[in-house]
């Protein structure tokens, strides 16, 4: 069973066709590298997978479920797009860490915001937040940054910032992890 299938994915910007019918599948545990010249559409493909850009044509299937079909999903709502994005963890080329937050807070922020939408959040706030913090600490430890969890991005090397970005992406427990220019 493929964890990800992309079928005939196209993306146009006006009359410029950037993605020209991309097809591939990815099995659980596999790694896939896209190699191409600058401007060939690698980042655009990742942005389409994560719905930062809306594909012009094609299908995206995750765990045998169609999450995007250009013919049927012209008007995906914000809630559905957010739900679809949870399948993909993104590590951006420039890492996109929040400079005003520590490494730990960069990792936990999205989960904290999502937790506030839980119906049991008010009654269990401390427990939920403690669990999220513990998971963030464990992920930072797993990428070798336990001692740096209270550092701000400007206090970290580029490689350390990248590892924070990886831990942040893993916090949402995505099905697929995408790296732009690792």
Regions found by a protein language model. Give the residues of each.
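The feature captures the beta-strand-to-loop junction immediately N-terminal to the Walker
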Residues: 35-37
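Helix-to-loop junction immediately C-terminal to a conserved catalytic motif
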Residues: 50
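Conserved ABC transporter NBD signature motif
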Residues: 58-71, 124
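ABC ATPase NBD coupling module
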Residues: 67-89, 127-129
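Conserved ABC ATPase signature
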Residues: 152-156, 160
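Hydrophobic anchor residue at the start of the ABC signature
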Residues: 166
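A short, proline-enriched helix->beta-strand linker immediately N-terminal to the Walker B motif
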Residues: 171-175, 181
């Amino acid at each position: 069973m493929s964890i990800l299938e992309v079928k005939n994915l196209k993306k146009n910007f006006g009359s410029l066709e950037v993605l020209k019918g991309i097809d591939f599948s990815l099995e659980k545990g596999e790694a896939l590298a896209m190699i191409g010249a600058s401007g060939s559409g690698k980042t655009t493909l990742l942005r389409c997978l994560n719905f930062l850009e809306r594909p012009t044509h094609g299908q995206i299937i995750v765990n045998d479920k169609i999450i995007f079909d250009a013919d049927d999903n012209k008007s995906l709502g914000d809630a559905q797009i957010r739900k679809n994005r949870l399948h993909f963890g993104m590590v951006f080329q420039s890492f996109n860490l929040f400079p005003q937050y520590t490494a730990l807070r960069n990792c936990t922020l999205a989960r904290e915001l999502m937790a506030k939408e839980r119906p049991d959040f008010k009654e269990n706030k401390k427990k939920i937040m403690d669990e999220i913090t513990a998971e963030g600490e464990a992920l930072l430890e797993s990428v070798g940054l336990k001692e740096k969890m209270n550092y701000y991005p400007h206090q970290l090397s580029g490689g350390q910032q990248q590892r924070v970005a990886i831990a942040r992406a893993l916090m949402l427990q995505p099905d697929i992890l995408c790296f732009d220019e690792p």
